[in-house]
């Protein structure tokens, strides 16, 4: 079983005291203010063999997301919708405690949060992925790989997922007497996305709340709360992690900070996506 850095007590007490003493002055180890996000870069179409892909670098955290489309049957309870399947892998090269093998509970949790944010926001219109109602639909496989764990991997996974979906090509479907097939030589458009979604994480360290915690900050945090937003700032996902607790006042303050951060991050994401 792999364990995430936030579960490892790897920061000496002296270093924690040093980090918190900087918080008292309103700054962090890397020079950021408590409410600042790390530098973000997004490279679209990074994996050429995928139908869509994006490489996201958030500080030292690096995540690659790729998509593949295939014709499939709809689920029985959603005959008029396409399918979305999200997988996240914490690669062993990303951090020293990550182990090879099937996804562990940390990877599964990340996949569920990303999936829930995309579904509950209706960012991806699954009804437009229907080829033949009740018979055939597009299944979107969204695979997310954490390549370098430098903290706050959830926000990076959401960014990479959304960017990869926006980058995804949809190919022509051809009807035959014996069924249907995909013509990979003819692109007919992109996935039917309504708008982007972002996730903003805020960590509680001692009495301080910090946006986009890095690896050291996650290692000493008491708890973390993550909010997912649509462009109209509707909350479409909330996830709390860490062993410590957060008061209602902490949560309210964290949400206010996350909301204002989401406005800026959504604008930056839109510029990268050209929308």
Curated annotation (Swiss-Prot):
Function noted in UniProt: Non-catalytic component of the exosome, which is a complex involved in RNA degradation. Contributes to the structuring of the Rrp41 active site.
CDD domains: RNase_PH_archRRP42
Subcellular location: Cytoplasm
GO biological process, one term: rRNA catabolic process
Record text on subunit structure and interactions: Component of the archaeal exosome complex. Forms a hexameric ring-like arrangement composed of 3 Rrp41-Rrp42 heterodimers. The hexameric ring associates with a trimer of Rrp4 and/or Csl4 subunits.
Outcome of swapping residue 116 to E: Abolishes exoribonuclease activity of the complex
Gene Ontology CC terms: cytoplasmic exosome (RNase complex)
Keyword check for Cytoplasm: yes
Name recorded for this polypeptide: Exosome complex component Rrp42
Xref: InterPro entries: ExoRNase_PH_dom1 (IPR001247), ExoRNase_PH_dom2 (IPR015847), ExoRNase_PH_dom2_sf (IPR036345), Exosome_comp_Rrp42_subfam (IPR050590), PNPase/RNase_PH_dom_sf (IPR027408), Ribosomal_Su5_D2-typ_SF (IPR020568), Rrp42_archaea (IPR020869)
Species of provenance: Saccharolobus solfataricus (strain ATCC 35092 / DSM 1617 / JCM 11322 / P2)
Pfam assignment, any one: RNase_PH_C
GO molecular function, one term: mRNA 3'-UTR AU-rich region binding
Keywords carried by this UniProt record: Cytoplasm, Exosome
Broad class of where this protein is predominantly found: cytoplasm
Taxonomy, superkingdom: Archaea
UniProt similarity note: Belongs to the RNase PH family. Rrp42 subfamily.
Gene name, Swiss-Prot/TrEMBL: rrp42
């Amino acid at each position: 079983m792999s364990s995430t850095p936030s579960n490892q007590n790897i920061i000496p007490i002296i270093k924690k005291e040093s980090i918190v003493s900087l918080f008292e002055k309103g700054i962090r180890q890397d020079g950021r203010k408590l409410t600042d996000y790390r530098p973000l870069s997004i490279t679209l179409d990074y994996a050429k063999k995928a139908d869509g892909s994006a490489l996201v670098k958030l500080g030292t955290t690096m995540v690659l997301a790729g998509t593949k489309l295939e014709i499939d049957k709809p689920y029985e309870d959603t005959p008029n919708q396409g399918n979305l399947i999200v997988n996240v892998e914490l690669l062993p090269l990303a951090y020293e405690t990550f182990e090879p093998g099937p996804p562990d509970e940390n990877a599964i949790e990340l996949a569920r949060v990303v999936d829930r944010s995309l579904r509950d926001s209706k960012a991806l219109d699954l009804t437009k992925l229907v080829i033949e109602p009740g018979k055939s639909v597009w299944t979107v496989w969204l695979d997310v790989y954490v390549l370098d764990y430098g903290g706050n991997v959830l926000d990076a996974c959401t960014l990479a997922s959304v960017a990869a979906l926006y980058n995804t090509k949809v190919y022509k479907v051809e009807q035959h007497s014996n069924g249907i097939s995909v013509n990979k030589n003819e692109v007919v458009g992109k996935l039917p996305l309504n708008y982007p979604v972002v996730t903003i994480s805020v960590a509680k360290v001692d009495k301080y709340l910090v946006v986009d915690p890095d690896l050291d900050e996650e290692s000493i945090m008491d708890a973390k709360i993550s909010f997912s937003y649509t462009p109209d700032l509707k909350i479409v996902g909330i996830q709390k992690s860490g062993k410590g607790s957060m008061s209602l006042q902490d949560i309210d303050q964290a949400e206010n900070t996350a909301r204002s951060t989401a406005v800026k991050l959504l604008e930056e994401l839109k510029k990268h996506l050209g929308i």
